[in-house]
Amino acid sequence: DPMKDKDVMNVLLIGEDLRDTETDDRGNTDAMLMLSLNKKNKTITMTSFMRDAWVNIGNYGMDKLNAAYWRGGPEMLEDTLENYYGVSIDRYVIVNFKSFIEVIDTIGGIKMDVRDDEAEGMKKPMAEQNKLLNKKKGTDYLKKGGTQLQLNGNQALSYARLRYVGNADYERTERQ
């Protein structure tokens, strides 16, 4: 069974939508990605889980997958993924808006292909982010899309959060 292979370590990346980093509250998970690191073959495989998938969450019954984290933290999310999808998770990493931006900025940004409709759609989540980060309105807006655009952390987060352009949550999961 590849999901329980001793040469493979599965790391769950949890993207939390928590905006206030000064609270102990949990947000929902906007992104849930599993990185499978194969030590033998020296390969990495990434699997995305749809946040709105309807699953059984322990004693809470049926709900959207992203509610598992909100209800019981990373442990309940792990249990739900393991029970529903049959995956084995060895470790997890949680990022929120601020840490996501910091990681992308630390590596010098990320190159992405961005369509014109995506560039326009990014303005709404970026307006919220700019307010949270005490940045001037309009900061980091893209004038238009393009190929291999160098996005900073704020722009990359807005791109990853974009959900009402294209095929809704399916394209959002692809962007993440």
Residue ranges, per PLM feature:
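Non-catalytic, solvent-exposed segments at the cell envelope interface
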Residues: 1-176
